[in-house]
Amino acid sequence: MEVKDIVFMNKGDGENSYVKSAGLTLKVIAKTQPMVQKAVQSLFKGTHSAPLQVVNVADLGCALAPQPLESMSIVIESIVEKCGELGCEMPEIQFHFNDLAGNDFNTLFKGLSVVQEKYKNVSWFAMGAPGSFHGRLFPRNSMHLVHSCYSVHWLSKAPKITSEEGLPLNKGKIYMSKTSXXXXXXXXXXXFEEDFSSVLRFRSPELAPDGRMVLILNGRQSADPTEKDICYLWDLLAEALSYLVSEGLIDEEKLDSFNVPYYNPSQEEVERVIDKEGSFTTEFSDTVVLEIGGKNAWSDPGLRIKGYRCFSEPVLSHQFGEEVMDKLFDKAEEILAEDYKQGKEATKNISIVVVLKKKTNQTWT
Protein backbone atom coordinates (compact mmCIF):
# COMPACT_ATOMS: atom_id res chain seq x y z
CA MET A 1 0.00 0.00 0.00
CA GLU A 2 1.39 3.40 -0.98
CA VAL A 3 0.76 5.78 1.88
CA LYS A 4 1.98 9.15 0.62
CA ASP A 5 -1.60 10.34 0.06
CA ILE A 6 -3.21 8.97 3.23
CA VAL A 7 -0.75 9.49 6.09
CA PHE A 8 -1.62 12.78 7.76
CA MET A 9 -3.11 13.99 11.01
CA ASN A 10 -6.84 14.68 11.42
CA LYS A 11 -7.58 18.03 9.84
CA GLY A 12 -9.29 21.21 11.04
CA ASP A 13 -9.99 22.13 14.64
CA GLY A 14 -12.99 19.94 15.42
CA GLU A 15 -13.53 17.51 18.28
CA ASN A 16 -11.37 14.74 16.79
CA SER A 17 -8.75 16.99 15.19
CA TYR A 18 -5.03 16.83 15.80
CA VAL A 19 -5.18 20.47 16.93
CA LYS A 20 -7.40 19.49 19.88
CA SER A 21 -5.65 16.23 20.78
CA ALA A 22 -1.88 16.68 20.31
CA GLY A 23 -1.13 17.03 24.03
CA LEU A 24 1.20 14.04 24.20
CA THR A 25 3.36 15.30 21.32
CA LEU A 26 3.65 18.68 23.04
CA LYS A 27 4.91 16.90 26.16
CA VAL A 28 7.51 15.12 24.04
CA ILE A 29 8.62 18.45 22.55
CA ALA A 30 8.93 19.98 26.03
CA LYS A 31 10.92 16.99 27.28
CA THR A 32 13.37 17.14 24.36
CA GLN A 33 13.66 20.95 24.26
CA PRO A 34 17.21 21.08 25.75
CA MET A 35 18.53 18.86 22.93
CA VAL A 36 16.95 21.07 20.28
CA GLN A 37 18.30 24.23 21.92
CA LYS A 38 21.82 22.81 22.01
CA ALA A 39 21.65 21.82 18.32
CA VAL A 40 20.40 25.27 17.30
CA GLN A 41 23.03 27.13 19.29
CA SER A 42 25.83 24.91 17.94
CA LEU A 43 25.19 26.48 14.51
CA PHE A 44 26.87 29.64 15.78
CA LYS A 45 30.20 28.08 16.74
CA GLY A 46 31.08 26.08 13.65
CA THR A 47 33.44 26.87 10.81
CA HIS A 48 31.46 29.81 9.42
CA SER A 49 33.79 32.68 8.51
CA ALA A 50 31.07 35.20 9.34
CA PRO A 51 27.89 35.19 11.43
CA LEU A 52 24.89 33.69 9.69
CA GLN A 53 22.65 36.31 8.11
CA VAL A 54 19.85 33.85 7.35
CA VAL A 55 19.10 30.59 9.16
CA ASN A 56 17.06 28.10 7.14
CA VAL A 57 15.08 25.64 9.25
CA ALA A 58 13.11 22.66 7.94
CA ASP A 59 10.41 20.89 9.95
CA LEU A 60 9.86 17.44 8.42
CA GLY A 61 6.39 15.94 8.78
CA CYS A 62 5.30 19.12 10.54
CA ALA A 63 1.57 18.21 10.76
CA LEU A 64 -0.43 21.19 12.01
CA ALA A 65 -0.72 23.44 15.05
CA PRO A 66 0.21 23.40 17.85
CA GLN A 67 3.20 21.04 17.39
CA PRO A 68 5.18 22.95 14.70
CA LEU A 69 4.46 26.30 16.36
CA GLU A 70 5.96 25.08 19.62
CA SER A 71 9.06 23.79 17.81
CA MET A 72 9.27 27.09 15.94
CA SER A 73 9.22 29.03 19.22
CA ILE A 74 12.03 26.91 20.65
CA VAL A 75 14.21 27.60 17.61
CA ILE A 76 13.56 31.36 17.69
CA GLU A 77 14.24 31.66 21.41
CA SER A 78 17.41 29.57 21.13
CA ILE A 79 18.79 31.86 18.40
CA VAL A 80 17.81 35.01 20.33
CA GLU A 81 19.58 33.68 23.42
CA LYS A 82 22.74 32.69 21.55
CA CYS A 83 22.98 35.98 19.65
CA GLY A 84 22.56 37.87 22.91
CA GLU A 85 25.35 35.81 24.43
CA LEU A 86 27.69 36.42 21.47
CA GLY A 87 26.66 40.04 20.97
CA CYS A 88 26.00 39.40 17.29
CA GLU A 89 23.19 40.63 15.08
CA MET A 90 20.08 38.46 14.91
CA PRO A 91 19.85 36.62 11.59
CA GLU A 92 16.63 36.36 9.65
CA ILE A 93 14.98 32.96 10.09
CA GLN A 94 13.24 31.09 7.27
CA PHE A 95 11.02 28.18 8.33
CA HIS A 96 10.17 25.50 5.76
CA PHE A 97 7.18 23.44 6.92
CA ASN A 98 7.25 20.07 5.19
CA ASP A 99 4.58 17.39 5.07
CA LEU A 100 2.71 15.30 2.54
CA ALA A 101 0.19 17.04 0.29
CA GLY A 102 -2.72 15.76 2.38
CA ASN A 103 -1.59 17.76 5.41
CA ASP A 104 -3.83 20.61 6.56
CA PHE A 105 -1.40 23.44 5.83
CA ASN A 106 -4.23 26.00 6.02
CA THR A 107 -4.84 25.32 9.71
CA LEU A 108 -1.09 25.41 10.33
CA PHE A 109 -0.65 28.81 8.69
CA LYS A 110 -3.67 30.25 10.52
CA GLY A 111 -1.84 29.49 13.76
CA LEU A 112 1.19 31.55 12.77
CA SER A 113 -0.53 34.70 13.98
CA VAL A 114 0.22 33.58 17.54
CA VAL A 115 3.95 33.35 16.76
CA GLN A 116 3.84 36.68 14.92
CA GLU A 117 2.39 38.40 17.97
CA LYS A 118 4.89 36.75 20.32
CA TYR A 119 8.02 37.56 18.28
CA LYS A 120 7.32 40.99 16.83
CA ASN A 121 10.97 42.00 17.01
CA VAL A 122 12.33 38.93 15.20
CA SER A 123 12.56 38.80 11.42
CA TRP A 124 11.17 35.39 10.50
CA PHE A 125 9.39 33.94 7.47
CA ALA A 126 7.38 30.78 6.86
CA MET A 127 6.59 28.71 3.81
CA GLY A 128 5.12 25.31 3.02
CA ALA A 129 7.24 22.58 1.45
CA PRO A 130 4.89 19.74 0.46
CA GLY A 131 6.48 16.43 -0.42
CA SER A 132 7.83 13.18 1.00
CA PHE A 133 10.91 13.30 3.22
CA HIS A 134 11.86 9.94 1.69
CA GLY A 135 13.03 11.97 -1.34
CA ARG A 136 14.74 15.31 -2.05
CA LEU A 137 12.95 18.42 -0.80
CA PHE A 138 15.41 21.34 -0.77
CA PRO A 139 18.36 22.74 -2.80
CA ARG A 140 21.91 21.67 -2.01
CA ASN A 141 23.60 23.19 1.04
CA SER A 142 20.51 25.26 1.84
CA MET A 143 19.35 24.06 5.28
CA HIS A 144 21.12 24.88 8.53
CA LEU A 145 18.77 22.93 10.79
CA VAL A 146 16.43 20.04 9.99
CA HIS A 147 13.99 19.12 12.74
CA SER A 148 11.42 16.35 12.91
CA CYS A 149 9.22 15.26 15.79
CA TYR A 150 7.19 12.04 15.56
CA SER A 151 7.32 11.70 11.79
CA VAL A 152 10.13 9.51 10.49
CA HIS A 153 8.84 6.38 12.25
CA TRP A 154 6.03 6.42 9.65
CA LEU A 155 7.00 4.15 6.75
CA SER A 156 6.70 4.96 3.06
CA LYS A 157 4.55 1.85 2.57
CA ALA A 158 2.94 -0.82 4.70
CA PRO A 159 5.24 -3.79 5.38
CA LYS A 160 4.41 -6.85 3.30
CA ILE A 161 3.80 -9.63 5.80
CA THR A 162 2.73 -12.58 3.66
CA SER A 163 3.75 -16.14 2.85
CA GLU A 164 5.42 -17.14 -0.41
CA GLU A 165 1.92 -17.86 -1.69
CA GLY A 166 0.82 -14.32 -0.82
CA LEU A 167 -1.30 -15.29 2.18
CA PRO A 168 -1.39 -12.88 5.16
CA LEU A 169 0.78 -13.91 8.11
CA ASN A 170 -0.45 -11.33 10.63
CA LYS A 171 -4.14 -12.20 10.71
CA GLY A 172 -6.32 -10.30 13.15
CA LYS A 173 -3.54 -7.79 13.88
CA ILE A 174 -2.52 -4.48 12.31
CA TYR A 175 0.96 -4.21 13.88
CA MET A 176 3.46 -6.54 15.50
CA SER A 177 2.29 -8.30 18.63
CA LYS A 178 3.26 -11.15 20.93
CA THR A 179 1.27 -13.52 18.70
CA SER A 180 2.74 -12.31 15.40
CA UNK A 181 5.01 -14.54 13.36
CA UNK A 182 8.74 -13.69 13.37
CA UNK A 183 8.34 -12.59 9.73
CA UNK A 184 6.19 -9.66 10.88
CA UNK A 185 8.98 -8.11 12.97
CA UNK A 186 11.62 -8.81 10.30
CA UNK A 187 9.55 -7.19 7.50
CA UNK A 188 8.77 -4.09 9.56
CA UNK A 189 12.39 -3.69 10.75
CA UNK A 190 13.73 -4.04 7.19
CA UNK A 191 11.24 -1.42 5.93
CA PHE A 192 12.25 1.01 8.66
CA GLU A 193 15.95 0.58 7.89
CA GLU A 194 15.33 1.24 4.20
CA ASP A 195 13.13 4.28 4.79
CA PHE A 196 15.23 5.83 7.55
CA SER A 197 18.33 5.42 5.40
CA SER A 198 16.61 7.34 2.61
CA VAL A 199 15.70 10.17 5.00
CA LEU A 200 19.37 10.50 5.95
CA ARG A 201 20.69 10.09 2.42
CA PHE A 202 18.44 12.78 0.93
CA ARG A 203 18.98 15.27 3.77
CA SER A 204 22.76 15.13 3.58
CA PRO A 205 23.18 17.16 0.35
CA GLU A 206 20.48 19.60 1.49
CA LEU A 207 22.24 20.55 4.73
CA ALA A 208 24.79 23.35 4.76
CA PRO A 209 28.30 22.69 6.10
CA ASP A 210 28.10 22.23 9.89
CA GLY A 211 24.32 21.80 9.55
CA ARG A 212 22.46 19.87 12.24
CA MET A 213 19.53 17.50 12.19
CA VAL A 214 17.35 16.75 15.23
CA LEU A 215 15.11 13.70 14.90
CA ILE A 216 12.60 12.60 17.54
CA LEU A 217 10.94 9.24 16.92
CA ASN A 218 8.31 7.25 18.76
CA GLY A 219 10.39 4.24 19.77
CA ARG A 220 10.92 1.52 22.34
CA GLN A 221 13.27 0.78 25.23
CA SER A 222 14.05 -2.90 24.73
CA ALA A 223 15.26 -5.12 21.91
CA ASP A 224 11.83 -6.75 21.82
CA PRO A 225 9.75 -5.09 19.06
CA THR A 226 6.55 -6.44 20.63
CA GLU A 227 6.96 -4.90 24.08
CA LYS A 228 3.68 -3.85 25.67
CA ASP A 229 4.10 -0.08 25.81
CA ILE A 230 4.60 0.29 22.05
CA CYS A 231 2.18 -2.37 20.81
CA TYR A 232 -0.70 -1.56 23.12
CA LEU A 233 -2.32 1.08 20.88
CA TRP A 234 -2.33 -1.12 17.79
CA ASP A 235 -3.43 -4.22 19.75
CA LEU A 236 -6.29 -2.17 21.17
CA LEU A 237 -7.41 -1.02 17.73
CA ALA A 238 -7.02 -4.53 16.29
CA GLU A 239 -9.31 -5.87 19.02
CA ALA A 240 -11.87 -3.18 18.24
CA LEU A 241 -11.60 -3.96 14.51
CA SER A 242 -12.11 -7.67 15.23
CA TYR A 243 -15.31 -6.75 17.03
CA LEU A 244 -16.51 -4.84 13.95
CA VAL A 245 -15.72 -7.94 11.87
CA SER A 246 -17.85 -10.06 14.21
CA GLU A 247 -20.67 -7.55 13.81
CA GLY A 248 -20.42 -7.77 10.02
CA LEU A 249 -19.42 -4.11 9.69
CA ILE A 250 -16.11 -4.76 7.94
CA ASP A 251 -14.71 -7.70 5.98
CA GLU A 252 -12.35 -10.03 7.79
CA GLU A 253 -10.09 -10.08 4.72
CA LYS A 254 -9.59 -6.31 5.02
CA LEU A 255 -8.37 -6.74 8.59
CA ASP A 256 -6.14 -9.74 7.89
CA SER A 257 -4.42 -8.05 4.94
CA PHE A 258 -3.80 -4.70 6.66
CA ASN A 259 -0.65 -3.58 8.50
CA VAL A 260 -0.03 0.00 9.59
CA PRO A 261 2.98 1.71 7.93
CA TYR A 262 4.61 2.41 11.28
CA TYR A 263 7.63 1.15 13.20
CA ASN A 264 8.86 1.87 16.73
CA PRO A 265 12.65 1.48 16.62
CA SER A 266 15.01 1.06 19.53
CA GLN A 267 17.84 3.52 20.13
CA GLU A 268 20.30 0.84 18.99
CA GLU A 269 18.43 0.35 15.70
CA VAL A 270 18.40 4.09 15.00
CA GLU A 271 22.12 4.43 15.72
CA ARG A 272 22.94 1.38 13.60
CA VAL A 273 21.17 2.81 10.54
CA ILE A 274 22.90 6.19 11.03
CA ASP A 275 26.32 4.54 11.21
CA LYS A 276 25.64 2.29 8.22
CA GLU A 277 24.30 5.10 6.01
CA GLY A 278 27.38 7.18 6.82
CA SER A 279 26.37 10.79 6.04
CA PHE A 280 26.24 12.04 9.64
CA THR A 281 28.06 11.88 12.94
CA THR A 282 25.94 11.49 16.06
CA GLU A 283 26.43 14.33 18.54
CA PHE A 284 23.74 13.17 20.95
CA SER A 285 21.49 10.14 21.30
CA ASP A 286 19.07 9.22 24.06
CA THR A 287 15.87 7.40 24.97
CA VAL A 288 13.27 9.62 26.63
CA VAL A 289 10.49 8.12 28.74
CA LEU A 290 7.18 9.81 29.54
CA GLU A 291 4.93 8.25 32.16
CA ILE A 292 1.35 8.19 30.87
CA GLY A 293 -0.16 5.89 33.46
CA GLY A 294 -1.67 6.86 36.79
CA LYS A 295 -3.50 10.10 37.40
CA ASN A 296 -2.79 12.41 34.48
CA ALA A 297 -4.60 13.86 31.49
CA TRP A 298 -4.51 10.45 29.77
CA SER A 299 -6.11 8.60 32.70
CA ASP A 300 -9.48 9.37 31.11
CA PRO A 301 -10.20 6.70 28.44
CA GLY A 302 -12.08 9.17 26.26
CA LEU A 303 -9.21 11.67 26.14
CA ARG A 304 -6.68 8.95 25.49
CA ILE A 305 -8.70 7.55 22.58
CA LYS A 306 -8.94 11.06 21.08
CA GLY A 307 -5.15 11.23 21.30
CA TYR A 308 -4.90 7.95 19.39
CA ARG A 309 -7.63 8.83 16.92
CA CYS A 310 -6.15 12.16 15.80
CA PHE A 311 -3.18 10.47 14.10
CA SER A 312 -4.41 6.94 13.31
CA GLU A 313 -7.84 7.67 11.83
CA PRO A 314 -6.81 8.81 8.31
CA VAL A 315 -4.93 5.61 7.48
CA LEU A 316 -7.57 3.41 9.14
CA SER A 317 -10.48 5.11 7.39
CA HIS A 318 -8.78 4.60 4.04
CA GLN A 319 -8.67 0.84 4.65
CA PHE A 320 -11.95 0.27 6.49
CA GLY A 321 -14.15 3.23 5.53
CA GLU A 322 -15.05 6.51 7.20
CA GLU A 323 -18.52 5.21 8.04
CA VAL A 324 -17.21 2.82 10.74
CA MET A 325 -14.71 5.16 12.43
CA ASP A 326 -17.04 6.35 15.21
CA LYS A 327 -17.98 2.76 16.04
CA LEU A 328 -14.34 1.69 15.93
CA PHE A 329 -13.11 4.30 18.38
CA ASP A 330 -16.17 3.96 20.63
CA LYS A 331 -15.38 0.25 20.95
CA ALA A 332 -11.70 1.02 21.52
CA GLU A 333 -12.66 3.38 24.35
CA GLU A 334 -14.83 0.66 25.88
CA ILE A 335 -11.94 -1.84 25.77
CA LEU A 336 -9.51 0.74 27.16
CA ALA A 337 -11.82 1.54 30.09
CA GLU A 338 -11.91 -2.15 30.99
CA ASP A 339 -8.12 -2.41 30.67
CA TYR A 340 -7.78 0.53 33.07
CA LYS A 341 -9.78 -1.38 35.67
CA GLN A 342 -7.45 -4.36 35.29
CA GLY A 343 -4.22 -2.35 35.03
CA LYS A 344 -3.50 -3.68 31.54
CA GLU A 345 -3.05 -0.38 29.68
CA ALA A 346 0.28 1.01 28.46
CA THR A 347 1.94 3.22 31.06
CA LYS A 348 4.90 4.67 29.17
CA ASN A 349 5.56 6.62 26.00
CA ILE A 350 9.03 6.11 24.58
CA SER A 351 10.89 8.58 22.37
CA ILE A 352 14.27 8.24 20.66
CA VAL A 353 16.06 11.55 20.08
CA VAL A 354 19.23 11.99 18.03
CA VAL A 355 21.20 15.13 17.15
CA LEU A 356 23.24 14.65 13.98
CA LYS A 357 25.95 16.73 12.31
CA LYS A 358 26.58 16.55 8.59
CA LYS A 359 29.96 15.08 7.72
CA THR A 360 32.26 17.21 5.58
CA ASN A 361 33.93 16.43 2.23
CA GLN A 362 31.08 14.32 0.88
CA THR A 363 30.14 13.74 -2.72
CA TRP A 364 26.65 12.94 -3.97
CA THR A 365 25.28 11.34 -7.06
UniProtKB/Swiss-Prot annotation:
<feature type="site" description="Involved in substrate discrimination">
    <location>
        <position position="262"/>
    </location>
</feature>
<comment type="similarity">
    <text>Belongs to the methyltransferase superfamily. Type-7 methyltransferase family.</text>
</comment>
<protein>
    <recommendedName>
        <fullName>Probable 7-methylxanthine methyltransferase 4</fullName>
        <ecNumber>2.1.1.159</ecNumber>
    </recommendedName>
</protein>
<feature type="binding site">
    <location>
        <position position="100"/>
    </location>
    <ligand>
        <name>S-adenosyl-L-homocysteine</name>
    </ligand>
</feature>
<feature type="binding site">
    <location>
        <position position="25"/>
    </location>
    <ligand>
        <name>theobromine</name>
    </ligand>
</feature>
<keyword id="KW-0460">Magnesium</keyword>
<comment type="function">
    <text>Involved in the biosynthesis of theobromine.</text>
</comment>
<feature type="binding site">
    <location>
        <position position="258"/>
    </location>
    <ligand>
        <name>Mg(2+)</name>
    </ligand>
</feature>
<feature type="binding site">
    <location>
        <position position="256"/>
    </location>
    <ligand>
        <name>Mg(2+)</name>
    </ligand>
</feature>
<comment type="pathway">
    <text>Alkaloid biosynthesis.</text>
</comment>
<feature type="binding site">
    <location>
        <position position="99"/>
    </location>
    <ligand>
        <name>S-adenosyl-L-homocysteine</name>
    </ligand>
</feature>
<feature type="binding site">
    <location>
        <position position="259"/>
    </location>
    <ligand>
        <name>Mg(2+)</name>
    </ligand>
</feature>
<feature type="binding site">
    <location>
        <position position="153"/>
    </location>
    <ligand>
        <name>theobromine</name>
    </ligand>
</feature>
<dbReference type="InterPro" id="IPR042086">
    <property type="entry name" value="MeTrfase_capping"/>
</dbReference>
<feature type="binding site">
    <location>
        <position position="311"/>
    </location>
    <ligand>
        <name>theobromine</name>
    </ligand>
</feature>
<feature type="binding site">
    <location>
        <position position="67"/>
    </location>
    <ligand>
        <name>S-adenosyl-L-homocysteine</name>
    </ligand>
</feature>
<dbReference type="GO" id="GO:0046872">
    <property type="term" value="F:metal ion binding"/>
</dbReference>
<dbReference type="InterPro" id="IPR005299">
    <property type="entry name" value="MeTrfase_7"/>
</dbReference>
<feature type="binding site">
    <location>
        <position position="62"/>
    </location>
    <ligand>
        <name>S-adenosyl-L-homocysteine</name>
    </ligand>
</feature>
<feature type="binding site">
    <location>
        <position position="170"/>
    </location>
    <ligand>
        <name>Mg(2+)</name>
    </ligand>
</feature>
<keyword id="KW-0479">Metal-binding</keyword>
<keyword id="KW-0808">Transferase</keyword>
<dbReference type="InterPro" id="IPR029063">
    <property type="entry name" value="SAM-dependent_MTases_sf"/>
</dbReference>
<feature type="binding site">
    <location>
        <position position="150"/>
    </location>
    <ligand>
        <name>theobromine</name>
    </ligand>
</feature>
<feature type="site" description="Involved in substrate discrimination">
    <location>
        <position position="322"/>
    </location>
</feature>
<feature type="binding site">
    <location>
        <position position="18"/>
    </location>
    <ligand>
        <name>S-adenosyl-L-homocysteine</name>
    </ligand>
</feature>
<dbReference type="Pfam" id="PF03492">
    <property type="entry name" value="Methyltransf_7"/>
</dbReference>
<feature type="site" description="Involved in substrate discrimination">
    <location>
        <position position="218"/>
    </location>
</feature>
<feature type="binding site">
    <location>
        <position position="154"/>
    </location>
    <ligand>
        <name>theobromine</name>
    </ligand>
</feature>
<feature type="binding site">
    <location>
        <position position="132"/>
    </location>
    <ligand>
        <name>S-adenosyl-L-homocysteine</name>
    </ligand>
</feature>
<dbReference type="GO" id="GO:0008757">
    <property type="term" value="F:S-adenosylmethionine-dependent methyltransferase activity"/>
</dbReference>
<keyword id="KW-0489">Methyltransferase</keyword>
<feature type="binding site">
    <location>
        <position position="133"/>
    </location>
    <ligand>
        <name>S-adenosyl-L-homocysteine</name>
    </ligand>
</feature>
<feature type="site" description="Involved in substrate discrimination">
    <location>
        <position position="147"/>
    </location>
</feature>
<dbReference type="GO" id="GO:0032259">
    <property type="term" value="P:methylation"/>
</dbReference>
